[in-house]
UniProtKB/Swiss-Prot annotation:
The keyword GTP-binding does not apply. GO terms for cellular component: extracellular region. Pfam families: Cu. It is found in: Secreted. This is Short cationic peptide-1e. GO terms for biological process: defense response to bacterium. Belongs to the cationic peptide 04 (cupiennin) family. 08 subfamily. It comes from the Eukaryota. The keyword Secreted applies.
Amino acid sequence: GFGSLFKFLAKKVAK
């Protein structure tokens, strides 16, 4: 779902 994708991107940009 889109929610999962958003969470994935959030983790990627999280530093």
